[in-house]
Amino acid sequence: QRQMCIRDSPCMAKKKEAREEDIADAIDYVLTFQEVQDIFDAAGIQPELLSEDEKEHSSRAGRIYARTGGVSEAVKKTVEQIDPDKKIPVIPEQADGVPACKKLIERIQKGETEANFFEGMACNGGCVGGPKIIIKKEEGKERVDAYGDEAQYKTPLENPFVLELLERLGYDSVENFLENSEILTRNFGE
Protein backbone atom coordinates (compact mmCIF):
# COMPACT_ATOMS: atom_id res chain seq x y z
CA GLN A 1 0.00 0.00 0.00
CA ARG A 2 1.38 3.38 -1.04
CA GLN A 3 1.92 5.99 1.65
CA MET A 4 0.98 9.61 0.99
CA CYS A 5 2.36 12.83 2.33
CA ILE A 6 -0.24 15.56 2.77
CA ARG A 7 0.90 18.97 3.97
CA ASP A 8 -1.63 21.17 5.73
CA SER A 9 -0.94 24.85 6.13
CA PRO A 10 -2.60 28.26 6.20
CA CYS A 11 -0.22 29.20 3.38
CA MET A 12 -1.24 29.32 -0.28
CA ALA A 13 2.43 29.51 -1.34
CA LYS A 14 3.00 25.96 -0.06
CA LYS A 15 0.84 24.64 -2.91
CA LYS A 16 3.27 26.07 -5.47
CA GLU A 17 6.34 25.24 -3.42
CA ALA A 18 5.36 21.56 -3.30
CA ARG A 19 5.62 21.44 -7.11
CA GLU A 20 9.18 22.78 -7.21
CA GLU A 21 11.44 20.35 -9.01
CA ASP A 22 13.79 19.48 -6.15
CA ILE A 23 10.99 18.52 -3.73
CA ALA A 24 8.12 17.61 -6.06
CA ASP A 25 8.28 13.91 -5.15
CA ALA A 26 8.24 14.59 -1.39
CA ILE A 27 4.68 15.92 -1.01
CA ASP A 28 1.61 14.45 -2.70
CA TYR A 29 -0.95 17.10 -1.76
CA VAL A 30 -1.10 20.44 0.02
CA LEU A 31 -4.33 21.44 1.72
CA THR A 32 -5.00 24.75 3.43
CA PHE A 33 -6.41 24.75 6.95
CA GLN A 34 -9.68 25.97 5.45
CA GLU A 35 -9.76 23.02 3.01
CA VAL A 36 -9.08 20.56 5.84
CA GLN A 37 -11.86 22.18 7.88
CA ASP A 38 -14.23 21.91 4.90
CA ILE A 39 -13.39 18.20 4.48
CA PHE A 40 -13.94 17.57 8.19
CA ASP A 41 -17.27 19.42 8.07
CA ALA A 42 -18.44 17.48 5.00
CA ALA A 43 -17.40 14.15 6.56
CA GLY A 44 -18.83 14.99 9.98
CA ILE A 45 -15.40 14.73 11.64
CA GLN A 46 -15.02 16.65 14.89
CA PRO A 47 -11.30 16.67 15.79
CA GLU A 48 -12.01 17.99 19.28
CA LEU A 49 -13.82 14.70 20.03
CA LEU A 50 -10.90 12.50 18.92
CA SER A 51 -8.41 11.15 21.44
CA GLU A 52 -5.02 12.80 21.46
CA ASP A 53 -1.92 11.03 20.20
CA GLU A 54 0.37 10.66 23.19
CA LYS A 55 3.36 9.87 20.96
CA GLU A 56 4.51 13.44 20.52
CA HIS A 57 8.15 13.49 19.47
CA SER A 58 8.53 17.09 18.33
CA SER A 59 10.69 19.62 20.15
CA ARG A 60 9.79 23.14 21.20
CA ALA A 61 12.09 24.35 18.42
CA GLY A 62 9.98 22.57 15.81
CA ARG A 63 6.65 23.53 17.32
CA ILE A 64 7.14 27.31 17.38
CA TYR A 65 8.16 27.83 13.72
CA ALA A 66 4.66 29.01 12.84
CA ARG A 67 4.93 32.38 14.55
CA THR A 68 7.22 35.34 14.01
CA GLY A 69 10.38 34.81 16.04
CA GLY A 70 9.91 31.05 16.19
CA VAL A 71 12.48 30.20 13.54
CA SER A 72 15.00 32.60 15.11
CA GLU A 73 14.52 31.13 18.57
CA ALA A 74 14.75 27.56 17.27
CA VAL A 75 17.96 28.22 15.32
CA LYS A 76 19.57 30.21 18.15
CA LYS A 77 18.83 27.57 20.82
CA THR A 78 19.92 24.69 18.57
CA VAL A 79 23.18 26.39 17.53
CA GLU A 80 23.90 27.21 21.18
CA GLN A 81 23.42 23.54 22.03
CA ILE A 82 25.60 22.31 19.17
CA ASP A 83 28.41 24.69 20.12
CA PRO A 84 27.93 26.39 23.51
CA ASP A 85 31.37 28.03 23.28
CA LYS A 86 30.70 29.52 19.85
CA LYS A 87 32.80 32.65 19.45
CA ILE A 88 30.19 34.33 17.27
CA PRO A 89 26.75 34.20 18.90
CA VAL A 90 23.57 34.00 16.85
CA ILE A 91 22.04 37.49 16.85
CA PRO A 92 18.61 37.23 15.26
CA GLU A 93 16.37 39.91 13.81
CA GLN A 94 12.85 39.35 12.55
CA ALA A 95 10.66 41.05 10.00
CA ASP A 96 6.91 40.60 10.24
CA GLY A 97 4.99 41.03 6.97
CA VAL A 98 6.18 41.81 3.42
CA PRO A 99 6.71 45.59 3.94
CA ALA A 100 8.83 44.89 7.03
CA CYS A 101 10.80 42.22 5.11
CA LYS A 102 11.59 44.74 2.38
CA LYS A 103 12.75 47.27 4.98
CA LEU A 104 14.90 44.65 6.68
CA ILE A 105 16.57 43.76 3.38
CA GLU A 106 17.30 47.46 2.79
CA ARG A 107 18.79 47.76 6.29
CA ILE A 108 20.96 44.68 5.68
CA GLN A 109 22.19 46.11 2.38
CA LYS A 110 23.05 49.42 4.09
CA GLY A 111 24.79 47.66 6.99
CA GLU A 112 22.31 49.10 9.48
CA THR A 113 21.91 46.00 11.64
CA GLU A 114 24.10 44.07 14.06
CA ALA A 115 22.16 40.83 13.50
CA ASN A 116 23.70 37.84 11.75
CA PHE A 117 20.55 35.71 11.37
CA PHE A 118 17.46 37.08 9.67
CA GLU A 119 13.92 35.74 9.77
CA GLY A 120 11.40 37.17 7.35
CA MET A 121 7.76 36.17 7.67
CA ALA A 122 5.68 37.27 4.69
CA CYS A 123 2.46 36.96 6.67
CA ASN A 124 1.91 39.25 9.65
CA GLY A 125 2.43 37.16 12.75
CA GLY A 126 4.08 34.40 10.74
CA CYS A 127 2.26 31.34 9.43
CA VAL A 128 -0.36 31.81 12.16
CA GLY A 129 -1.41 34.91 10.19
CA GLY A 130 -1.57 33.16 6.80
CA PRO A 131 -4.38 33.79 4.31
CA LYS A 132 -6.21 30.52 5.02
CA ILE A 133 -6.20 30.54 8.82
CA ILE A 134 -9.34 29.39 10.59
CA ILE A 135 -8.69 31.16 13.91
CA LYS A 136 -7.41 34.67 14.66
CA LYS A 137 -3.64 35.03 14.41
CA GLU A 138 -3.35 36.15 18.05
CA GLU A 139 -5.07 32.95 19.18
CA GLY A 140 -2.88 30.99 16.78
CA LYS A 141 0.27 32.48 18.32
CA GLU A 142 -0.97 31.70 21.84
CA ARG A 143 -1.71 28.11 20.84
CA VAL A 144 1.67 27.71 19.11
CA ASP A 145 3.48 29.04 22.19
CA ALA A 146 1.46 26.81 24.54
CA TYR A 147 2.13 23.79 22.31
CA GLY A 148 5.84 24.67 22.32
CA ASP A 149 5.85 24.97 26.11
CA GLU A 150 4.37 21.45 26.38
CA ALA A 151 7.21 19.88 24.38
CA GLN A 152 9.30 17.32 26.20
CA TYR A 153 12.44 18.43 24.33
CA LYS A 154 13.68 21.98 23.72
CA THR A 155 15.58 21.21 20.49
CA PRO A 156 16.00 18.22 18.16
CA LEU A 157 19.41 17.62 19.78
CA GLU A 158 17.68 16.46 22.98
CA ASN A 159 15.21 14.26 21.15
CA PRO A 160 16.16 10.56 21.33
CA PHE A 161 13.92 9.81 18.34
CA VAL A 162 15.88 12.25 16.16
CA LEU A 163 19.19 10.85 17.39
CA GLU A 164 18.01 7.28 16.71
CA LEU A 165 16.92 8.25 13.20
CA LEU A 166 20.32 9.83 12.50
CA GLU A 167 22.02 6.65 13.71
CA ARG A 168 19.83 4.53 11.42
CA LEU A 169 20.87 6.80 8.54
CA GLY A 170 24.52 6.16 9.35
CA TYR A 171 25.41 9.33 11.28
CA ASP A 172 27.00 9.01 14.72
CA SER A 173 26.17 12.57 15.80
CA VAL A 174 24.23 15.66 14.79
CA GLU A 175 27.51 17.35 13.96
CA ASN A 176 28.47 14.47 11.63
CA PHE A 177 25.06 14.73 9.97
CA LEU A 178 25.38 18.50 9.43
CA GLU A 179 28.90 18.14 8.01
CA ASN A 180 28.14 15.25 5.65
CA SER A 181 24.51 15.52 4.60
CA GLU A 182 22.93 17.59 1.87
CA ILE A 183 19.43 16.97 3.23
CA LEU A 184 19.16 20.60 4.36
CA THR A 185 20.27 21.93 0.98
CA ARG A 186 17.75 23.05 -1.64
CA ASN A 187 18.59 23.30 -5.33
CA PHE A 188 16.72 26.21 -6.87
CA GLY A 189 18.37 25.82 -10.28
CA GLU A 190 19.98 28.70 -12.09
Named regions from a protein language model:
Residues 7, 15-17:
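Proline/glycine-rich low-complexity loops and linkers
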Residues 2-6:
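Short, small-residue-biased leader/transition segments that mark boundaries at the very start
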Residues 11:
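Phosphate/adenylate-binding glycine loop and adjacent helical scaffold
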Residues 1, 14:
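Mid-sequence acidic-hydrophobic segments that form the walls
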Residues 19, 24-190:
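Iron-sulfur (Fe-S) cluster-binding modules
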